[in-house]
Amino acid sequence: MHIHRTRIVITSSRDPSIRTRNFLNVLTFVLPDSVKITRGKKSKIEIFERAINLGALYLLFVLAKNGNPLRIIVYDLESLSIKYFFKLSGLSLPSDYNVSLNQIKGHSNVCIKLNECDFLRDFLVDMNMYNLTNNCDVVVNSRLIHTNICELLFMLTTKNIKFLKMILEA
């Protein structure tokens, strides 16, 4: 029997908007070995403790402003320090592409097809998206838009359906 290991815990700031909750759900589908924790009234310390108790390596926080996801902060749970910090300057969710979450569920084999963004390489590997085989349910392409600004595009390989786009600034 295969035991699922939690590698990444995903959460948000308190009282997230529907858009932020949807983004967290999509991240949970596309980041292998990840689990979402609802923040609720939990303190940051309680979230860290829960992630450590789950045996996770990373804690990914999505911070929002005016209901829109604005920043992604990834903590290394071994050193308890920030490992990655990105400003989210653009976001298209599955609903923006008329794709339902049910179409995305169960597609856990994520492969990097193209990576033009050096500053995202380690992040993608740490988020368990390093498979370079042809057995991919989802492919990720990263395209350099400007120095330290990159577009990440996620597509279902079965029908070449785009379902998630993020513009990340380092």
UniProtKB/Swiss-Prot annotation:
SUPFAM superfamilies: Class II aaRS ABD-related (SSF52954). It comes from Saccharolobus solfataricus (strain ATCC 35092 / DSM 1617 / JCM 11322 / P2). The keyword Ligase does not apply. Signal peptide: none annotated. The keyword Transmembrane does not apply. This is Probable Brix domain-containing ribosomal biogenesis protein. GO terms for molecular function: rRNA binding. One of its GO terms (biological process) is rRNA processing. Probably involved in the biogenesis of the ribosome. Residues 6-170 form the Brix domain. Coiled coil: none annotated. Keywords: Ribosome biogenesis. It comes from the Archaea.
